[in-house]
Curated annotation (Swiss-Prot):
It is found in: Cytoplasm; Nucleus. This is Polyubiquitin 9. The keyword Nucleus applies. Coiled coil: none annotated. Belongs to the ubiquitin family. Ubiquitin exists either covalently attached to another protein, or free (unanchored). When covalently bound, it is conjugated to target proteins via an isopeptide bond either as a monomer (monoubiquitin), a polymer linked via different Lys residues of the ubiquitin (polyubiquitin chains) or a linear polymer linked via the initiator Met of the ubiquitin (linear polyubiquitin chains). InterPro entries: Ubiquitin-like_dom (IPR000626), Ubiquitin-like_domsf (IPR029071), Ubiquitin_CS (IPR019954), Ubiquitin_dom (IPR019956), Ubiquitin_ubiquitin-like (IPR050158). GO terms for biological process: ubiquitin-dependent protein catabolic process. One of its GO terms (cellular component) is nucleolus. One of its GO terms (molecular function) is mRNA binding. The lineage of its organism: Eukaryota, Viridiplantae, Streptophyta, Embryophyta, Tracheophyta. It comes from the Eukaryota. Keywords: Cytoplasm, Isopeptide bond, Nucleus, Repeat, Ubl conjugation pathway. Ubiquitin is encoded by 16 different genes. Ubiquitin is generally synthesized as a polyubiquitin precursor with tandem head to tail repeats. Often, there is one to three additional amino acids after the last repeat, removed in the mature protein. Alternatively, ubiquitin extension protein is synthesized as a single copy of ubiquitin fused to a ribosomal protein (either eL40 or eS31) or to a ubiquitin-related protein (either RUB1 or RUB2). Following translation, extension protein is cleaved from ubiquitin.
């Protein structure tokens, strides 16, 4: 019985093909050649993440009416790519752009003995799905993938909010910051674009993995919210000068000192910031942690090299009494 199936190309073009379930994959490739002019030996057809063998039939792969195959082109001669492990070792692989991620994992298993189900491959900050091809991710000659190992059973980490609530998350070291934000959204309903995650005083970049930041079992991240549009605050110096800064409540004190350095050329390690009589600590502490809001005024005093801060006691009292 005749039916229609579809073949999707790497350019997102969809080809509709009239077939019967007893057609071989070779027959299907011949039909694609008739429609698109692509030689049979340059075609690779993929369905449900599997590369289809020429001699098998559509029925063998349970390909039914309106199924979608993916058409990838076989590069003549293939190409080399590199896979970097967490230990810094680099593996060289011979591949084709039409190879699926499954195929790549099998090649890694052949070289390194790591079972595919324990592998996670990352490229350009994205975890690669098994059924997709290298071409789907625009992985080209001499591209470098990153290999991280999937921990059996994963691990637990904690996320602490500004309200001191602690969220427990089940993660793996290969999860990206994006993945973690999605898990937080599932639990707390906070959109990822409003989240900032801080660990060891550093803001985590979306495309990086937990392993990149050495985040391990039972580590604690700090969650601060990104204010849409930010806010202005002021910084008064001992000379009476007022600096205006554009900030967000999720900015760390380190971030604020960096902004002051940009404006005033004062090194962060020479700055001390005071608000409401309290010295602000570097690291993961944010403006929100100190309840610093729109148009708040901080006081800047300079740390003398090798000694105390000039005017520190005077300014502390001034701030405390204001």
């Amino acid at each position: 019985m005749s039916m229609q199936i579809h073949a999707k190309t790497l350019t997102e073009k969809t080809i509709t093909i009239d077939v019967v379930s007893s057609d071989t994959i070779n027959n299907v490739k011949a039909k694609i050649q008739d429609i698109e002019g692509i030689p049979l030996d340059q075609q690779r057809l993929i369905f449900s993440g599997k590369l289809l063998d020429d001699g098998r039939t559509l029925a063998d792969y349970s390909i039914q009416k309106d199924s979608i195959l993916h058409l990838a082109l076989r590069l003549r001669g293939g190409m080399q790519i590199f896979v970097k492990t967490l230990t810094g070792k680099t593996i060289t692989l011979e591949v084709e752009s039409s190879d699926t991620i499954d195929n790549v994992k099998a090649k890694i298993q052949d070289k390194e003995g790591v079972p595919p189900d324990q592998q996670r491959l990352i490229f350009a900050g994205k975890q690669l799905d098994d059924g997709r091809t290298l071409a789907d991710y625009n992985i080209q000659k001499e591209s470098t993938l990153h290999l991280v190992l999937r921990l059996r059973g994963g691990m637990q980490i904690f996320v602490r909010t500004l309200t001191r609530k602690t969220i427990a998350l089940e993660v793996e070291s290969s999860d990206t910051t994006d993945n973690v934000k999605a898990k937080i959204q599932d639990k707390e309903g906070i959109p990822p674009d409003q989240q900032r995650l801080i660990f060891a005083g550093k803001q985590l970049e979306d495309g990086r993995t937990l392993a990149d930041y050495n985040i391990q079992k039972e580590s604690t991240l700090h969650l601060v919210l990104r204010l849409c549009g930010g806010m202005q605050i002021f910084v008064n110096t001992l000379t009476g000068k007022t600096i205006t800064l554009e900030v967000e409540s999720s900015d760390t004190i380190d971030n604020v000192k960096a902004k002051i350095q940009d404006k005033e050329r004062i090194q962060p390690d020479q700055q001390r910031l005071i608000f409401a009589g309290e010295q602000l600590e570097d690291g993961y502490y944010t403006l929100a942690d100190y309840n610093i809001q729109k148009e708040s005024t901080l006081h800047l005093v300079l740390r003398l090299r090798g000694g105390e801060c000039f005017g520190f006691i005077f300014l502390f009292l001034l701030c405390f009494n204001s």
